[in-house]
Amino acid sequence: MKKIDKKEKAIVIIGSGAGGGTMAYELTKAGIPCVCLEAGPYLKPEDYTNDEWGAFGQMAWLDKRTTSGTWRVSKDFPGLPTWLVKAVGGTTTHWAGATPRFLEYEFKTKSTYGNVKDASLMDWPISLDDMKPYYTKAENAIGSTHRGGRAPLPANNNYKVFANGAKNVGYKFYATGPYGTNAEPYDGRPGSIQDGFNFQGDKNGSKWSTAKREIPRALETGLLDLRTNAHVVKITHDKNGNVDGVLYMDDANNLQRQEARVVVVSGNSIESPRLLLLSESNMYPDGLANSSGQVGRNYMRHMTCLLYTSPSPRDP
């Protein structure tokens, strides 16, 4: 693995997940050296555990948090904001693998829904047609099923029940995907054995993650300096306001500084804005890259809908 001097003004990538891991691979593939600072360890397939809570303790950000709000489902984890991974590969090592494209109307939410009370809807300045070539490129890298001629995942019994219900009420389009888990061998990864445990760390290696694809390939170029257990605390800038370095705590809890000419912030939806806000200064009192005042505001990371049924009436 390449070692880049801390005094060298390098391209520094913060985070090794979907954004950071992909950036590291694309840069090194093009012959450009870079440093990637990852807050967690480099877990290998044999390290993963087939237990959801065990995996949480192994992979998630367990740092103490301050949260606000009045309604929480979880009572035993009052400071838990969300399931984000602190390890090489980031949250690509813990995801269901669903890779749907936006629909056309989702790029135009304000035009579609109008002014919604207490919401901040906006139309994207791009369209589905603008994104199609990039969707295709990402799907080919991930190996999304149902795309590019790739086979769908086999239907399990749960899917068959829902598919039959959808058919009976008149739906015509339903499918097992697209997903980033191989139904057949693809791009050096095997087909899924559907063991039920590839959501939180995939021992079989059939699911795409940057820990499985992009980071190893970037390391193979000899141009990536991957520093694990490197927790970034601040991005610094010079007297002209240009970013010039990154401060981070190493695995021995020592404060280190990497000089930088470019910094890529890719720490997922919570850590990225948090870091930008923590990097405030006299020149940037509201944090870096925050001229709009919107960093950390009006953003929803993830929405999950769950439907439960019971064969017999139950008390409320």
Summary of predicted features, one role per range:
Residues 106, 111-232:
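Conserved redox-cofactor binding core of oxidoreductases
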Residues 29, 33, 40-51, 235, ...:
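Glycine-rich loop(s) and the adjacent beta-strand/alpha-helix scaffold that form part
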Residues 311-316:
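A short, hydrophobic C-terminal helix/tail in secreted or cell-surface proteins
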Residues 55-151:
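Redox-cofactor-proximal catalytic regions of oxidoreductases
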Residues 228-242:
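A conserved short coil-to-beta-strand element within the FAD-binding core of flavoproteins
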Residues 11-35:
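N-terminal Rossmann-like FAD-binding beta1-loop-alpha1 element of flavoenzymes
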Residues 1-7:
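A short, basic/flexible loop-to-alpha-helix module at the beginning of a structural domain
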Residues 75-80, 85, 147-150, 170-180, ...:
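A short alpha-helix-loop-beta-strand transition element characteristic
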